[in-house]
Amino acid sequence: MPLLSIVIPVYNVQNYLEQCLNSILDQDFKDYEVILVDNASTDKSGGICDNYALEYENIKVIHLYKNCLPAGARNIGLKNAMGKYVHFCDSDDYYTKNSFSYISNTINETFPDVIVGKFICKPEKGAFHFNDVNYNIRIFKEMNTDAIVEHLSNFSDSICTVWRFIANRKFLIKNKITFLEGYNCEDEEWVPKLICTANTFSLIEEPFYCYRPRKSGSITSTKTYMNSSRSQLATAISLLKFLKEKNCIGIRKKYIMSRVKFLIGLFATRCDTFIRSEMIELAKIIEDNMEYFNCLKEISKTGEFFDFVNRYGSCIGLALYRTYIIEKTVEKVYGNEDKKIYIFPTGYNGEGTARILKNEGYKVEGFLDNSNTKNGCIIDGLEVNLPSILKNIDDEKLSNIFIVISTQKRQVVEILRNQLKSLNIKENQFAIRIY
């Protein structure tokens, strides 16, 4: 039995896969197995998998003839894994030098349920850069599980990526911590369940993983009904089920509820786009899971969603909620129809706000965003600019600008509000849209 199983779902990554696999083969630690799950690739990825499996006895390949999304591929990999610990690697990323030694040393020192890892970011040209969070090493060394869960929940928007964690395989199997199949935001479901079930944690203090954001071509690069809205609702429901079944209390309940609120907020940003057939499917999902929706009453904002479906039923309630989201968004610019409207920043929330306003007949000039990488990009037909462009506008034209700050994070709202004020934007020149 190897110490470590590396499970890698593979789908159309012929330009990245060899670097990923070579970063494993170059490790100085060798007590591992690699399980490649070729998820019905249509490029040369399957052949690359076969070549490595033929040359190296600790690399295995499983070919799927129907794509089952990353969740299905990971579950198949987990079923075939033999290692004491499991790591799920993305096939377009790779490992840092000596990272397996960091992992093995951590395992042999403490044998935790879950190991939390750090990463470095190497984006492709034109892709966005992401910074790692600053973990408090002392909290992990004190081994107070509740304190660790609370600490991780403080970074909840940043840590919901499967590759951050190495988990004890028997712990995963015993607690039935698998991936929600048929949906695309499986990380958002798996990570909270993992964190809220684990009793022991350890932290690898050195970055062990290299995350490579891609400019385009990833499975989640396009926001659609199938890969976002439907998945967000299903994932939120799955977490509510987990909350009820495990009877989570204290910080664990608070953490799960915060992720549900986040997911329902994302769901709200696209509900204006739903067509009739999608509304019917979503209503059926809601109808089948109404028993879990009582929890939503405890969360502000998502309570509105619950109120509509509880009072009017899943189908009419969802339709009324969609109308409510549109009207609440339009309300933010009421009386400023004649001004140049900008949305600040980009992202699910900002892009949803811009789309709703455009579809309701408002002229949106563009986005403001603090990302240098996004500066000059075109998103949904709108140009992205740094907020500093406001410095170059004379007072008369500046007074004719109206900005909607659109995000889910209240602490970010205050930062952006103060930034706009420093650029001579007055209080009556911006509104805040939180989903």
Give the residues covered by each predicted segment:
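Glycine-rich, basic loop-to-helix element that forms the pyrophosphate-binding segment
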Residues: 64-81, 88
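Donor-binding/catalytic cores of nucleotide-activated saccharide
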Residues: 67, 71-73, 91-205, 209-227
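A conserved acidic beta->alpha catalytic loop
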Residues: 23, 30, 38-47, 66, ...
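Phosphate-bearing ligand-interacting subdomains
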Residues: 372-435
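Cell-envelope/extracellular polymer assembly enzymes that use nucleotide-activated donors
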Residues: 2-5, 23, 33, 189
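Short, well-formed alpha-helical segments that are part of the catalytic scaffolds
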Residues: 12-26
